[in-house]
Amino acid sequence: MALLRALVCGLLTAWLYCSGLGLPVAPAGRRNPPPAVGQFWHVTDLHLDPTYHITDDHTKVCASSKGANASNPGPFGDVLCDSPYQLILSAFDFIKTSGQEASFMIWTGDSPPHVPVPELSTDTVINVITNMTTTIQSLFPNLQVFPALGNHDYWPQDQLPVVTSKVYNAVANLWKPWLDEEAISTLRRGGFYSQKVTTNPNLRIISLNTNLYYGPNIKTLNKTDPANQFEWLESTLNSSQQNKEKVYIIAHVPVGYLPYSKSITAIREYYNEKLIDIFRKYSDVIAGQFYGHTHRDSIMVLSDKKGSPVNSLFVAPAVTPVKSVSEKQTNNPGVRLFQYDPRDYKLLDVLQYYLNLTEANLKGESIWKLEYILTQTYDIEDLQPESLYGLAKQFAILDSSGVHVQILQDCYIDIHMPWWFAASIAPSPMLDISNSIPPQSPYPLLSFP
């Protein structure tokens, strides 16, 4: 499978800050506001580092820096470290006090830090997930939350098994307040489940364990259907189709190619193709897909075999700001709010929020800000696959002209890699609209010399 990449990473920023170059500025407001709007939050990749602390020895600020000098550690973290608890608490406190009413929250995995395997254990991983779960439950006692397991939510990392395990049992017990008995049962068995939304009885969440398909997972090598999840998924989607339900798919590791590669799928290619086939077959049932893992803000459009767009997929940016020493750039912490039509669960919009980490550390307070509203910034009708596909075609025209490359060169310094992706000539079931630079912030990307 080839993935057509038609959107420049960060082009949106260029629209907003380089208006002198003659590109259109999106008008404010949606063209056709719906009579009612439902909302839900998406948080991902919390990556709590319990060892984080301020010390004069910057090599010892956090275990997740792996001995590297933390660059500018403050109360809300550092770009070479995973999240201190104060950062995670500030994210959830912002959600709680934002004034936005939401029907539910999706939480797509990865609670433990990025540290070498010997520095963790099964009990430590469970303790971190417990900490994050109880934090969410204490702040949102009446909100239904739908978690998905990440590749770091296990020890050793990535090695999630095809049978029940201590971690699967632990999270099943922790997440009982949010799930029914059938969901708990499948969660114990294979780390996945489906569950109706209490406030929206015709909407079902399917939480997949895509870590079973992740390349580094040696537990699933040479298995055609690890934990029988494919069979279960098809059966669940078929039941939803018969019962006239709509489904949101959530998972940690996304389908499709990685945002920084034109040839590497995030999961093993066989499993990727199998999931794509299932998603195409039930595209009339699936109303949206939501992932984490890459820490990058990305959008993909799934097309059917005739090339028509049939599904919208969203990869959310992370709460953790961590990067490796070799990386030049990283993300500010982010959370997002999706809007949907409660009549048919079609996705209408996404509001992306971020925390300027440098500013928060300097001021000693966290002020989360609206980064962008997708439909207003891009001047599209909604988040339906047809709208996103039309947007991608506009960027493909810009891509063929080379205009956007010059825009990025004019608007950014310290760009050491091409922030554009050539369109693939091969037939493509998925169109990747990837945007890894936050588009509206005066500090859109933390950058390093």
Regions found by a protein language model. Name each.
Residues 3-22:
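Cleavable N-terminal signal peptides of Sec/SRP-targeted secreted and luminal proteins
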Residues 18-107, 166-239, 243, 296-449:
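Metal-dependent phosphoesterase/phosphodiesterase active-site architecture
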Residues 42-44, 103-110, 141-150, 248-252, ...:
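Active-site neighborhood of phospho(di)ester-bond hydrolases with catalytic His/Asp-centered motifs
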Residues 50-52, 113-116, 147-158, 214-216, ...:
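Active-site environment of divalent metal-dependent phosphoester hydrolases
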Residues 84-149:
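Long, well-ordered early-domain segments
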Residues 109-134, 154-171, 259-264, 299-305:
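Metal-dependent catalytic neighborhoods of phosphoester/phosphodiester hydrolases
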Residues 125-139, 166-185, 268, 272-280:
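Acidic, His- and aromatic-enriched active-site or binding-groove loops in soluble protein domains
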Residues 215-230, 238-291:
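Active-site-proximal segments of metal-dependent phosphoesterases and phosphodiesterases across multiple
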